Amino acid sequence: TVVYSEKHKDEVHTYVITNHHVISDSVKIEKKWDSVLKRKVDKEKLDTVFVEFFRYNNYSHTVGSFAVEADIVAYSEVEGGQDWALLRVRDKENKADWVANMFPLDDIENVHIFDKSYAVGASLGHPPVASEGMITYMDDEIDSYKYWMSSAPTIFGNSGGAVYRWSIARKRYEYIGIPSRISIQPMGFSADAITHMGYFIPIERVYKLLEENNYQFIYDEKISIDDCNKARKKKQEPKKDEDE
């Protein structure tokens, strides 16, 4: 889901949020020999990923799609992590046609069970499919992380897409989370997907992940890209021992 696409210093910055398990094959940890430490160390290798954009007539009829290269700029693994990834699109000349409106962080308390929700994703590899439901549960924890549940039907392929909620006050659909998991019912040697019990990463966690990785400019116009880049660079600098 495109969450930011703006021009800064003659260069367009477009960012996409997805699940880590969607792009996990492009994240590799390899053992490399370190000539200074005289031992093998883990080295991260991030392959290029592709983001597919769709074109529509009258907002509803798919007339084509195109893929654009992107870089993985932040992530949290699915195993024991938060199953989240942030991508930066390499096209630095063209803004994205559509950018999701993020649900305001200071309005989270006004999200309730029975609120209508809408899931959008590439269900079973299909071009984006929309489904309608409601927020049905807001207190589940998986691997110690909070998930919300929606009855908007989702299936394999929805991961990394979006869940939206209509804001009556702001008169727009707003991004409230990332479809990430679906419930399954074991049936002998197989399992049935319970499509109306889909778990999604709630928007409050999305905000926290962006903050932890210093990408606050995506949701807060008072914070600049330059400030975030400086903070991220400082965080990545090797820490000096206090005794030095």
Label every model-predicted segment:
Residues N19-H21, A122, I168, R181:
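Short, surface-exposed secondary-structure boundary micro-motifs
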Residues S24, V41-D140:
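Serine endopeptidase catalytic core focused on the charge-relay Asp
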Residues S26-V63, K95, Y175-E244:
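C-terminal cap/linker of serine protease catalytic domains
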Residues R90-M102, P127-E211:
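Active-site region of chymotrypsin-like
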Residues D10-V12, E79-L86, I142-A152:
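Short, solvent-exposed secondary-structure boundary/capping segments
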Residues T1-K45:
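Catalytic histidine site
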